[in-house]
């Protein structure tokens, strides 16, 4: 395995790209570089990485007891691959940094961190998660949500529908959320209602960020916002209750948000990578499927092309005027 630029990336660059990252959460780096005679490039002697794989499982709001569930999946993969597999828990940012610093081989990532993992670690998505709450199997909708009794109505065109939001109080999920900010902002730009993300205040009467799906929806339920932007699956427990769901409706939807998936580091040899993918696909089989469902409520993993899967996100980022 070769040492790539990510292995020698300066601390300052990494800090800028991944603000607030706690790299030490993943322990000490076990790899050292050794120059092999008659070779122009350095070869990574991964002390332990040749006989241990590390998988990062990001914590999500709909996941509970994640370490034990991740350990169960790691144990299954270890049995299939014949090598120890270690499960690490951390947020998406820490997962990307672990890939960059060669402290992890595999990570479950949402789409925006997957782009960052490609940029910083040359990692790529090979599998995507399927959920019953995803309308597009391994893509889902970003939705503009209003109170059920709102005077705002879905019109014959997207522009006519969204034009009604001028001067209204808007609750986005967070400035980094794909379905809760990037895709809805890209849609507003596409319809010619705003120029980019920096002009949202010129269109809405108020712009706020809930911090997560639940809080953005609660802002609408409590009358603090006229509309919220979230993922379609957030209109279900545990994000809100069934009673709260019945008080809301979707005003407009934006399709094509890439589902979360599994990224594999480029330092993993091709043959090993294919074995990892095959082992993970065994989680789709009935006798193993509960292990997968327990993680993030996904029912299946499917193979995807990295560039094709993330293309809608790249387009939305460009429309919104946001760097990948």
Model-derived features: positions:
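A conserved helix-loop-strand patch within extracytoplasmic ligand-binding domains
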Residues: 130-181, 186-191
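Hydrophobic residues within well-ordered alpha-helices
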Residues: 99-100, 165, 220-221
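Periplasmic-binding protein-like
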Residues: 50, 54, 58-59, 127-143, ...
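Short, glycine-/small- and polar/acidic-enriched structural segments
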Residues: 43-153
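Ligand-binding cleft/hinge of the Venus flytrap
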Residues: 72-81, 166, 179-209, 239-243, ...
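N-terminal hydrophobic or amphipathic helices and topogenic motifs
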Residues: 2-94, 290-324
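A ligand-binding cleft/hinge motif common to bilobed small-molecule-binding domains
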Residues: 111-122, 184-190, 218-246
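Short helix-initiation/N-cap motifs at beta->coil->alpha
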Residues: 87-97, 112, 195-218, 256
């Amino acid at each position: 395995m070769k040492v790539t630029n990510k292995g020698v990336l300066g601390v300052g660059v990494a800090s800028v790209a991944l603000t607030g990252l706690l790299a030490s959460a993943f322990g000490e780096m076990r790899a050292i570089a050794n120059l092999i005679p008659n070779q122009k490039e350095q070869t990574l002697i991964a002390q332990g990485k040749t006989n241990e794989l590390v998988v990062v499982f990001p914590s999500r709001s709909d996941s509970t007891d994640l370490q034990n569930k991740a350990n169960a999946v790691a144990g299954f993969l270890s049995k299939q691959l014949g090598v120890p597999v270690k499960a690490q828990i951390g947020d998406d940012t820490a997962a990307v940094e672990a890939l960059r610093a060669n402290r992890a081989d595999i990570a479950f990532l949402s789409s925006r961190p997957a782009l960052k993992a490609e940029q910083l670690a040359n990692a790529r998505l090979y599998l995507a998660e399927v959920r019953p709450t995803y309308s597009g199997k391994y893509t889902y909708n970003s939705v503009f949500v209003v109170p059920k009794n709102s005077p705002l109505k879905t019109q014959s065109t997207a522009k006519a529908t969204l034009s009604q939001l001028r001067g209204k109080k808007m609750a986005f999920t967070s400035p980094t959320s794909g379905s809760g900010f990037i895709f809805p902002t890209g849609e507003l730009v596409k319809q010619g209602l705003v120029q980019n993300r920096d002009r949202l205040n010129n269109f809405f009467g108020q712009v706020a960020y809930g911090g997560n799906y639940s809080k953005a929806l609660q802002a609408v339920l409590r009358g603090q916002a006229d509309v919220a932007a979230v993922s379609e699956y957030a209109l279900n427990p545990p994000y809100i209750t069934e009673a709260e769901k019945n008080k809301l409706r979707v005003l407009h939807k934006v399709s094509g948000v890439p589902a979360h998936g599994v990224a594999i580091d480029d330092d993993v040899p091709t043959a090993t990578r294919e074995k990892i993918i095959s082992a993970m696909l065994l989680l789709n089989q009935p006798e193993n499927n509960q292990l997968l469902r327990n993680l993030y409520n996904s029912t299946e993993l499917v193979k995807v092309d990295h560039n094709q899967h993330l293309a809608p996100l790249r387009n939305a980022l460009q429309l919104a005027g946001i760097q990948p």
